[in-house]
From Swiss-Prot:
Name of the top EC class for this enzyme: transferase
GO molecular function, a single term: nicotinate-nucleotide adenylyltransferase activity
Keyword Transit peptide: no
Lineage: Bacteria, Bacillati, Actinomycetota, Actinomycetes, Micromonosporales
Function: Catalyzes the reversible adenylation of nicotinate mononucleotide (NaMN) to nicotinic acid adenine dinucleotide (NaAD).
GO terms classed as biological process: NAD biosynthetic process
Cysteine pairings via disulfide bonds: none
Entry protein name: Probable nicotinate-nucleotide adenylyltransferase
Length: 188
């Protein structure tokens, strides 16, 4: 599951769990982006903080793992590089699924080396409350959409809540709330 995870929240975790169940996945590898190319003009927390929050959030689920593959690579993070690296680690016999939000999937036609990406993995777009995928040009054999239980939580809202000293409890895992406070993330 790729994402910025700035911060990771319960919506991400529920989505990963639902997709793992529906597709019979042995494990879900969370891959926090290093330098997200789509967010070059937006402030993003340090990769190490986002990685550690993801480790904290996923620690209690034995099916969840976290990879440093993107944050250890220099330069902008492209999904194709992530998939190539995961293929090298997992081997050719393992079927890869790339889980992302449907809003990110809507922009997939602009992604780097898209044809190769479709050869390397099956893409799963997780629908969020109120979101409708408007692009009908996605190949049905390599892209699936999955509706998950409605959880109107976003990382953007979580950051805004912290910046205005609003409670974050129960939107993100407890350990992530504590990590954000300790590192003083998202405070202006």
């Amino acid at each position: 599951m790729g994402g910025t995870f700035d911060p990771i929240h319960h919506g991400h975790l529920v989505a990963a769990s639902e997709v793992a169940d529906r597709f019979g996945l042995d494990e879900v590898i969370f891959v926090p982006t290093g330098q997200p190319w789509q967010k070059a003009d937006e402030p993003v927390s340090p990769a190490e903080d986002r990685y550690l929050m993801t480790v904290i959030a996923t620690a209690s689920n034995p099916r969840f793992q976290v990879s440093r593959v993107d944050i250890d690579r220099s330069g902008p993070t492209y999904t194709i590089d992530t998939l190539r690296d995961l293929r090298a680690v997992c081997g050719a016999k393992v079927q890869l699924f790339f889980i992302t939000g449907a809003d990110a999937l809507e922009k997939i036609l602009s992604w780097k080396d898209l044809d190769e990406a479709f050869e390397l993995a099956h893409f799963i777009g997780v629908t969020r409350p109120g979101f409708r995928l408007s692009d009908a040009h996605l190949p049905a054999d390599t892209v699936s959409l999955v509706q998950v239980p409605a959880m109107a939580i976003s990382s953007t809202d979580c950051r805004a809540r912290v910046s205005r000293s609003a409670p974050l409890w129960y939107l993100v895992p407890d350990g992530v709330v504590q990590y954000i406070a300790k590192r003083r993330l998202y405070q202006q």
